[in-house]
């Protein structure tokens, strides 16, 4: 082994011969061909050269060594690679130090030794080390042959190993130290230990290998880690076995308790069976070392046997089952069927099981619920539900909705507990959707509502803006039925909301929908502030919306813009030139004066508001207008407020729902989506929604249908109440819809019976609009704490046969708290009743005074249409309210602007006389129309 050829060494290193010759020449070893022999010194020189060239610090080199065996099976060569191991190769410096130490042990160097003797001694030591390595390899081979297949040696002969990654064959060095690696699992259990022991030297003269202190410490550390890992695995296995034993014991205990309770109930009490399984499982918890891999394998095998019945394999499977059956007392039964499973019974256990009690469910019943959903909540079949309802006289299907009362009766009849659930609130459902899908808020166009008196030029202003900015040059303008449109300006887009009257605007505010961002208040410069103007200001302030005042008709000679500013200042609308915050723009809708300045002011207000809305989210909006089209069905104008509305979305609007089949913009063009503040016409709803209804997109069609049906049932009573309110004698039935006022009272009496009787009598006075709230009642005099409670709650104090002390009276006088003293209970009840009556709103009744028939319509320029009429019934007064009726349909409700007989203004005209009259703010009258005159009378109400 000491002399090998270059070609053999290159094959061992798996490198070309030319590269090896080149490296040998660079290392100072002169070799010319592959047949030249290599000595041990040549290899050491090559190793030292390559170590320096590769930048190594001269430390130990680790090489992964594998053993490859080639065998011939049926004429085919088969290459088998066995498990590799890591060999630590010392550097040249370490090797030289080991050789020197070996020389020192073999023969101490004499002081007078010459240089030639030292060289000879080193050569002899190297030869002895090589001979010792050969002897160790031969001894290991002999022991491996004796051990046979029981334990394979983990350390292979150095001559049979091949280095995979190292460029040099350092494994042929004479003094190779024994590596210390982590042992395999079978070696940890004591197998193959003899193979790991180094062979004894063949000749006693050969010295033992030298092991450095650092390497010995490394070996000890690895041994300590292996022992710690082994102990940790054993502890985990022991803990697992203990946990499994405890689980089995608890399971047995629970089964025994259940069995004892069942026997006690049926009257056949038996002694409880002692717990045997925990004792049987006790040996598994013995403190003995267990191989983790073997334990895991056995545990997996046991689980497979328990889960799939693998113990019954082989010829003796049947006998094994019979033996197990006999061990269990013979109580093993086979279920019917092709794959009949064994029903294992405990000893002395009967196959008959007592019937369990029926499970009682607590069912939450909403306002409306389908038969199938109710059956699912009670865990019964739908057929049983339909049968129970048919016995009640209701012929329903499984998909039909039933009301809450009926559902509660059926739930109780079937033996379950029914409780009314909270109503499904669509707003709460919408809030959940918004929380689940939060989108980034982006700037959106402002929504502007134009308000004001009809005669002040509101319609003309909208027409001019529409004609000038929206469809310039298009014939016919925009679609006339839509109530909203947007205008593009150089500074941005503005969406105008054109709702007839104030009903939709008020409905939006009542529902809390912020549909309008800015209000343009139109006031005629020649007319001044009218009652409807004041009403519009109140609406805008209630909504917290900024106002931009457009003073119209400044082109008239009688225009006085300064008077408009003064009148609006009285209603807290102060111009910005006067130190206020409201912009005033003088415009002319007829000539188009300052229209651009008005739009500029609106965009300035919108910029201050910083209006934003999420775009990538389900759409929410408000219904501006809705109608029933003959060819297209229900058509609704929707103003999108948040999100993006897309074609095909499931929309819910009030009691109507449906998938959007088509979307049309204000120009009549078909579109597929609309973003925030964009109005669209939509088709596909199941019914015509009301103006002002909130609309939202839901992902679930079932949820949309459920909410729509719930709203239909909820609003049914409201619609009936509205129909009853049309009758004069049933006006009181509509009182409960308004928010009730509260009268807070604190009662102090001399005895307990007095304040209990007084509190009970006062609570009976509560009505739909006014309720009595007894905050506190007690026995004794009136104290400062009672007065402080009255101050905080705004209540007044009733003292029944008691008085207040001096400090309480002084505090009540300073804080304006009313204290009333009574000795008779009826006086207290009458005073509280009178106070509650004063809190009631007066009752308003319409009293019809006369009927007028229009027989002629006269059009006068700059004045309007004048109606020539005949009073057919009653009397017509100048200050009467009128109702215009055409074909038995009410067209308009308003007031009279003037009433004349011939050319004289009169206060009233009686039946049988002719008269001429004009309607205030309305000119669309025709011959044959009828006017119904009525007065509104307020009547004080009492309890």
From Swiss-Prot:
Does the record bear Cytoplasm in its keywords? yes
Q: Where does it reside? A: Cytoplasm
Q: Where is this region: G4?
A: 552-555
Record field: compositional bias (Basic and acidic residues): 117-141, 173-197, 216-250, 295-308, 319-335
Any coiled-coil regions, as ranges = none
Low complexity compositional bias, start-end: 99-113, 145-172, 200-215, 251-264
The record's annotation in CDD domains points to: IF2_eIF5B, IF2_mtIF2_II, mtIF2_IVc
Gene Ontology molecular functions: GTP binding; GTPase activity; translation initiation factor activity
Q: Where is this region: G3?
A: 498-501
Q: Where does GTP bind?
A: 452-459, 498-502, 552-555
Q: Which InterPro entries does this one have?
A: DNA-bd_dom_put_sf, EF-G-like_DII, IF2_II, IF2_N, P-loop_NTPase, Small_GTP-bd, T_Tr_GTP-bd_dom, TF_IF2_bacterial-like
Q: Which domain of life is it from?
A: Bacteria
Q: What is one Pfam family matched by this protein?
A: IF2_N
Limits of the tr-type G domain = 443-612
A single Gene Ontology CC term: cytosol
The segment annotated G2 runs over: 477-481
Chief localization: cytoplasm
Query: Which parts of this chain are annotated as the region Disordered?
Result: 99-354
* Region of interest: G5: 588-590
PANTHER family reported for this sequence: TR-TYPE G DOMAIN-CONTAINING PROTEIN (PTHR43381:SF5), TRANSLATION INITIATION FACTOR IF-2-RELATED (PTHR43381)
Q: What does this protein do?
A: One of the essential components for the initiation of protein synthesis. Protects formylmethionyl-tRNA from spontaneous hydrolysis and promotes its binding to the 30S ribosomal subunits. Also involved in the hydrolysis of GTP during the formation of the 70S ribosomal complex.
- Sequence similarity: Belongs to the TRAFAC class translation factor GTPase superfamily. Classic translation factor GTPase family. IF-2 subfamily.
- Name this protein carries in UniProt: Translation initiation factor IF-2
Species this protein is from: Neisseria gonorrhoeae (strain ATCC 700825 / FA 1090)
**Gene name of this polypeptide:** infB
């Amino acid at each position: 082994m000491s002399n090998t050829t270059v070609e053999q060494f290159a094959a061992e290193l798996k490198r070309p011969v030319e590269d090896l010759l080149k490296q040998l020449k660079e290392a100072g070893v002169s070799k010319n061909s592959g047949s030249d022999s290599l000595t041990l010194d040549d290899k050491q020189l090559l190793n030292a050269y390559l170590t320096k060239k590769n930048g190594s610090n001269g430390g130990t080199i680790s090489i992964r060594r594998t053993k490859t065996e080639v065998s011939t099976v049926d004429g085919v060569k088969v290459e088998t690679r066995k498990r590799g191991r890591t060999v630590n190769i010392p550097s040249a410096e370490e090797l030289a130090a080991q050789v020197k130490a070996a020389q020192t042990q073999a023969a101490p160097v004499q002081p007078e030794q010459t240089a030639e003797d030292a060289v000879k001694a080193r050569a002899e030591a190297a030869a002895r080390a090589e001979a010792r390595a050969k002897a160790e390899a031969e001894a290991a081979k002999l022991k491996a042959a004796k051990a046979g297949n029981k334990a394979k040696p983990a350390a292979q002969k150095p001559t049979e190993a091949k280095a995979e990654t190292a460029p040099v064959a350092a494994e042929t060095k004479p003094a190779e130290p024994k590596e210390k690696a982590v042992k395999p699992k079978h070696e940890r259990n004591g197998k193959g230990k003899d193979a790991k022991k180094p062979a004894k030297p063949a000749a006693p003269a050969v010295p033992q290998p030298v092991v450095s202190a650092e390497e010995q410490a490394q070996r000890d550390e690895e041994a300590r880690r292996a022992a710690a890992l082994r102990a940790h695995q054993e502890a985990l296995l022991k803990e697992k076995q203990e946990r499994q034993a405890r689980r089995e014991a608890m399971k047995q205990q629970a089964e025994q308790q259940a069995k004892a309770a069942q026997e006690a109930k049926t009257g056949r009490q038996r002694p409880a069976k002692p717990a045997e399984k925990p004792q049987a499982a006790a040996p598994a918890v013995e403190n003995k070392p267990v191989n983790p891999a073997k334990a895991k394998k056995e545990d997996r095998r046991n689980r497979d046997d328990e889960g799939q019945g693998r113990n019954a394999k082989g010829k003796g499977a049947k006998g094994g089952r019979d033996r197990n059956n006999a061990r269990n007392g013979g109580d093993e039964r086979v279920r019917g069927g092709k794959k009949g499973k064994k029903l294992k019974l405990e000893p002395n256990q009967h196959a008959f099981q007592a019937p369990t009690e029926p499970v009682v469910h607590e069912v939450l019943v909403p306002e409306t619920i389908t038969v199938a959903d109710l059956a699912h909540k009670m865990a019964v079949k739908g057929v049983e539900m339909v049968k129970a309802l048919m016995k009640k006289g209701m012929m329903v299907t499984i998909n039909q909705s039933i009301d809450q009362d009926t559902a509660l009766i059926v739930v109780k009849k079937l033996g379950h507990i029914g409780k009314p659930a909270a109503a499904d609130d669509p707003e709460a459902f919408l809030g959940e959707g918004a929380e689940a899908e939060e989108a980034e808020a982006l700037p959106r166009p402002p929504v502007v509502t134009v308000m004001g008196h009809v005669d002040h030029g509101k319609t003309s202003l909208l027409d001019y803006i529409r004609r000038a900015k929206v469809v310039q040059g298009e014939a016919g303008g925009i679609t006339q039925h839509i109530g909203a449109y947007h205008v593009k300006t150089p500074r941005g887009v503005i969406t105008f909301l054109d709702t007839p009257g104030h009903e939709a605007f008020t409905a939006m505010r009542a529902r809390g929908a912020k549909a309008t961002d800015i209000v343009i208040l139109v006031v005629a410069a020649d007319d001044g502030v009218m009652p409807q103007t004041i009403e519009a200001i109140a609406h805008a302030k209630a909504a917290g919306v900024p106002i931009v005042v457009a003073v119209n008709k400044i082109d008239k000679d009688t225009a006085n813009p300064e008077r408009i500013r003064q009148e609006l200042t009285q209603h807290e609308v102060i111009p910005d030139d006067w130190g206020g915050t409201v912009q005033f723009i003088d415009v002319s809708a007829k000539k188009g004066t300052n229209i651009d300045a008005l739009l500029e002011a609106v965009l300035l207000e919108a910029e201050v508001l910083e209006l934003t809305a999420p775009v990538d989210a389900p759409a929410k909006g408000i219904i501006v207008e809705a109608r029933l089209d003959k060819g297209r069905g229900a058509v609704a104008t929707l103003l999108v407020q948040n999100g993006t509305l897309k074609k095909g979305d499931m929309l819910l609007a009030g009691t109507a729902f449906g998938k959007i089949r088509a979307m049309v913009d204000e120009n009549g063009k078909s579109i597929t989506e609309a973003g925030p503040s964009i109005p669209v016409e939509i088709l596909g709803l199941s019914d015509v929604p009301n103006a002002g209804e909130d609309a939202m997109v839901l992902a679930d069609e079932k949820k949309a249908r459920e909410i729509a049906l719930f709203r239909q049932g909820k609003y049914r009573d409201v619609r009936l109440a509205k129909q009853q309110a049309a009758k004069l004698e049933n006006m009181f039935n509509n009182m409960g819809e308004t928010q009730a006022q509260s009268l807070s009272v604190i009662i102090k009496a001399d005895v307990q019976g007095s304040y209990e009787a007084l509190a009970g009598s006062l609570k009976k006075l509560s009505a739909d609009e006014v309720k009595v709230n007894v905050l506190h009642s007690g026995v004794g005099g009136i104290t400062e704490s009672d007065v402080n409670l009255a101050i905080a709650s705004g209540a007044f104090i009733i003292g029944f046969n008691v008085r207040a002390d001096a400090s309480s009276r002084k505090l009540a006088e300073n804080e304006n708290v009313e204290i009333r003293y009574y000795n008779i209970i009826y006086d207290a009840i009458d005073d509280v009743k009178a106070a509650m009556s004063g809190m009631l709103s007066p009752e308003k009744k319409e009293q019809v005074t006369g009927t007028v028939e229009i027989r002629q319509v006269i059009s006068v320029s700059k004045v309007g249409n004048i109606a020539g009429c005949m009073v057919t019934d009653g009397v017509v007064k100048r200050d009467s309210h009128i109702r215009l009726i055409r074909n038995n349909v009410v067209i308009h409700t308003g007031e009279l602007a003037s009433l004349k007989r011939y050319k004289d203004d009169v206060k009233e005209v009686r039946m049988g006389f002719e008269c001429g009259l004009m309607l205030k703010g309305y000119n669309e009258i025709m011959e044959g129309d009828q006017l119904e005159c009525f007065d509104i009378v307020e009547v004080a109400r009492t309890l």
